[in-house]
């Protein structure tokens, strides 16, 4: 869940950037035409893989195509933002793919070597080759643990 929320917050910021461009056109009529896939699954692996696919689609071809149209219409600053954000979408796709790979390999909560695992709820760090089944501090389940090196805002 945390990887989806973390990414969604970044996507929200992308939306704000484009919303601010729209605000500059207040009072005008513009046409916006687009579609977006609806991928709702109960299976986490399917969610991760579809998120990976959709982020890669935004990376190439969707956002570069939007950038080209913006540039053709004289909105070079908007085109530049689409190109910059496209690169971020690739990072999102890579992240979803990494977690999907770990899940497929049965290594999301298990490692071949000793690692530090962080509870994303309370910050408890556990050193072992496997994340605990539940956090000994806050009792949240294993799903709240990530490798410390993958936890947001950590410096190693």
What is the meaning of each model-derived region?
Residues 1-156:
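Non-heme di-metal
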